[in-house]
Structure formats: structure tokens, C-alpha cells
UniProtKB/Swiss-Prot annotation:
The keyword Membrane does not apply. The gene is FRAA1A.1. May be involved in ripening of fruits. Pfam families: Bet_v_1 (PF00407). This is Major strawberry allergen Fra a 1-A. GO terms for molecular function: abscisic acid binding; protein phosphatase inhibitor activity; signaling receptor activity. One of its GO terms (biological process) is abscisic acid-activated signaling pathway. It comes from the Eukaryota. The keyword S-adenosyl-L-methionine does not apply. Monomer. It comes from Fragaria ananassa (Strawberry).
Length: 160
């Protein structure tokens, strides 16, 4: 088994506390509302939403995947960090056991946010994951993030 790590960093004009509330804490409600073609629904299968919780995300008709299951490892509201693993679903190929994700939102000097993400692909056997394989997922996540950012700009009184 191998572990392949990819890091990404991008910025937003939205303050970190507001972005964390929308992007992490209320994502299960907000994303199906603003991008139903991407995510149809999210439901908790086990737990209370905190660490140890298992969630099932059902994708919308615009996706070529059906569902995934996430296991939440940590949510730190004060430091704006979130970590979880993709543990099941058709987004995992036969060569990938799981994918660990860590997201940290850091307040930027200009009042916005620096978003730092780390993805760790745990492969089965000697399979190698190349960055080109990860690129499509990064692009979809970036598009979804831009939708959330746009929603927050259009609805400035929400998530304060």
C-alpha cells in the first residue's frame, strides 16, 4: 500500500469564520440547495455530526458518481479545521482504499481567507496515483467552492 499526498492552497475574500460555517458546518444543507446537480443530499448514518460520524453523500444527476461515505475525524470551530476520510463509494476506484482530507481556513491579512487542503490517497498494492488523476477532482471541488463563495457574496447577512 502506498500513500500519495497532494496539497493545494487558494484564497477567498470571505472571512474565515463565515466561510467555515457555510463550507464545513452547513455544507450538507447549503450544497444541495445551490448545486443540486452536483449533490442531491447528505445524510448522517451514524453519530451526531462530530468526530466518528459517518455521512452518506448522494450525488445529483449531473455527476457520474452515485454516492460516497465520509468518516469525520475532527472539526475545530475555533481554528477552522476539518478532517475526514472518503471510505466508501463509487468515487473510489478499485486501486484506492480511502482518501484522507484535511482542510484549514486561515484568516488572511486583507480580511479574507487562505484555504489550505491536503489529500492523502491510500492505494491498494503498488498502484501509483499521479497528480493528473487528481486534477479532475480538484477542479470539481474548486467549482463547488466558487459556488459557495458566490452564494455568500449574494447573501451577505447569512452565516454571520
Amino acid at each position: 500500500m502506498g500513500v500519495y499526498t497532494y496539497e493545494n492552497e487558494f484564497t477567498s475574500d470571505i472571512p474565515a469564520p463565515k466561510l467555515f460555517k457555510a463550507f464545513v458546518l452547513d455544507a450538507d444543507n447549503l450544497i444541495p440547495k445551490i448545486a443540486p446537480q452536483a449533490v442531491k443530499c447528505a445524510e448522517i448514518l451514524e453519530g451526531d455530526g462530530g468526530p466518528g460520524t459517518i455521512k452518506k453523500i448522494t450525488f445529483g444527476e449531473g455527476s457520474h458518481y452515485g454516492y460516497v461515505k465520509h468518516k469525520i475525524h475532527s472539526i475545530d470551530k475555533e481554528n477552522h479545521t476539518y478532517s475526514y476520510s472518503l471510505i466508501e463509494g463509487d468515487a473510489l476506484s478499485d486501486n484506492i482504499e480511502k482518501i484522507d482530507y484535511e482542510t484549514k481556513l486561515v484568516s488572511a491579512p486583507h480580511g479574507g481567507t487562505v484555504i489550505k487542503t491536503t489529500s492523502k490517497y491510500h492505494t491498494k498494492g503498488d498502484v501509483e496515483i499521479k497528480e493528473e488523476h487528481v486534477k479532475a477532482g480538484k477542479e470539481k471541488a474548486s467549482h463547488l467552492f466558487k459556488l459557495i463563495e458566490g452564494y455568500l457574496k449574494d447573501h451577505p447577512s447569512e452565516y454571520n
